[in-house]
Amino acid sequence: MGGVIILTSILIPVLLVGKLHSVYTLLMIATTLVLGILGFADDYIKTFKHNKDGLKPKVKLGGQVLLGLIVGLTLRFSPAVQINETVEVKIENNKEIVVKSPDVKSTRTTIPFVKNHNLNYADLFRWAGPKWMYNLAWVFLVLLTVFIVAAVSNGSNLNDGMDGMASGNSAIIGLTLLLLAYISSNAVTASHLDLMYIPGSEELVVFLAAFVGALIGFLWFNSFPAQIFMGDTGSLTIGGIIAVSAIIMHKELLLPLLCGVFLFEIFANFDVGHFVKHGKKHRIWKKAPLHDHFRTSYSDFKKAWPNSTVTFKGRGDGFNNVHHEVKITIRFWIVTILLAAFTLLTFKIR
């Protein structure tokens, strides 16, 4: 239940420094509390009730869906949630003058590899006509929010299986989102990078700074050999914070790239789960989540599943060599750093 320490380390500075009337601050606090309570209940059942299954999956998913609906509907109906779609910086008398368009409630989002970095979800529903296209876009966006919150929080939860794994990866992702939040909150910087300016998103900078600081402090004691563990209290909440902050900044479509490690953890878990449930003879990974694949020898896999085959057997004499968890963790960090760097580079690739 070390995740309680992470949550406390986030909430105290936010409550002291943040603007509590900001809708963005309130959404992030709600995310922390809802998923924190959900994760704590799961840890409590596992630890004190001695039930290794913990909270029922339907209850856990229900909590994630509820949070996703709260976030999505708040973004839809709160008058305080608006963006500035176009910001121009003009030079007059050797001075920069910022020219902004009116703040609007928008269904636009940031998408990499395209000329203006923008995708309007309403464009996907032009077939419905001008009367319905924006309403359908918001319905889609709310459902997408629910999916992203559930997917990223579960991905973070699956990633928490080795000392320092989830805390290190999440700190890197959080630092990237912190930089994006700063850019989104600054009209001049947003204009230079051709990104949306989001008034009030400076409160996300405060929250994400506390988030990254809490994770780095936790990593000090969670690195191998770990003295403390975050449990579901920490891992579920961390994923939710990453998801909701990206959605608020209209950067949710960057998450498959930025959180690629979480994505592959989910894929590996689905692959192995499908294999076990349906009695398949072949699977891609030896074990799930993905990080466990790298510390499972091929001989151990064959002992457990003698009549089964696997795509990625591993390397070494007889495919029996496995990596130490420290090496696996550091390599996962390196992959996350590369994904974070590439995520930022996408703004210059058109």
Question: Predicted segments — roles?
Answer:
Residues 125-148:
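Glycine-rich adenosyl-nucleotide cofactor-binding module
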Residues 57-61:
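Individual transmembrane alpha-helices with interfacial aromatic-anchor signatures
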Residues 35-46:
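Alpha-helical transmembrane segments within multi-pass membrane transporters and channels
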Residues 46-56:
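Membrane interface segments of multi-pass transport proteins and intramembrane proteases
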Residues 6-37, 64-92, 97-109, 140-350:
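Alpha-helical transmembrane segments
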Residues 92-133:
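Extracytosolic (periplasmic/ER-lumenal) interhelical loops and adjacent juxtamembrane/interface segments
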